[in-house]
Amino acid sequence: MSEAKVRDVSRHTVPRQSTGNQARSAGATHPGFKREQNEDALWSDEQRGVWVVADGLGGHQAGEIASKTVVEEIQRSAATDRHYEHALQRAHALLLGDEQSAANMGSTAVVVAEEGAYFHIYWVGDSRAYLWSPGEGHGRLKQLTNDHSYVQMLVDSGAINPQEAASHPNRHVITRCIGGSTNPSLDVDRMSSPWQAGDRLLLCSDGLSAEVEPQAIAEILSCNDDCRRAADLLIAAALDAGGKDNITVQVIDAPDPARLSGSDYMGADTPSPARLGNTARIVLAVVTAAALASGFAGWLLGLIPH
């Protein structure tokens, strides 16, 4: 499907926000061909350096409400304390407090927050952040987030490999989300990294990552300098692959090199450059392996389908 055809189909492109300099980010979302509603949500504020993608689940407008709740809490935090981990936890509490949500109203989320020459990523579920860096061929595309999903737990435990995970029948089952459970606590994974000149971040729902191969994503990001065009072509690629789910993307370019060279600030409330939460993931892998060995895998299959 062509970029122009994508723009003709009912979907929303987020206007790139700028404060005088050329905008360096753009987002787009599309319901796909198989879903009546678009339960994804996205928001960005380039001036404040915040971007979010949320993928709602639950059906019958429940997912739409959940993803909107996530976005609203990120907006609130961007305008006040900039504590995005707390914002996701507030959204979790709000959804648990909704009488309709205890059973199945939930959302994934991936958030990017910029602090000087660094960016920080917060995520829950299987919405992803990728880092594209220039290089030979179509550059290098690296997945920065680790899915909170059943198949990722199997990969971490060594039960299956990533290739098997891509076609696993339970690849859409997630093990952590905002809302969607009766657990009052929510663990938010975080990582941080310095921007490098020429870098480009991609946030997306699984409507893109489950349909389009990383090589194709890297080619689109490398061949299209304009963020809006890149976002539209990513949507088009997912639609060409079948458009079986809602599709949402945000493309974010690194700040101007002059800004990078003049800033080394990291906020006091932001995590260290190393990804946090390794211990928790190791424990999860051990627990998963034990569950598989003990015949409790069926319990995991009862987790939220995505």
Predicted features, each with a name:
Residues M1-H306:
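PP2C/PPM-type serine/threonine phosphatase catalytic domain
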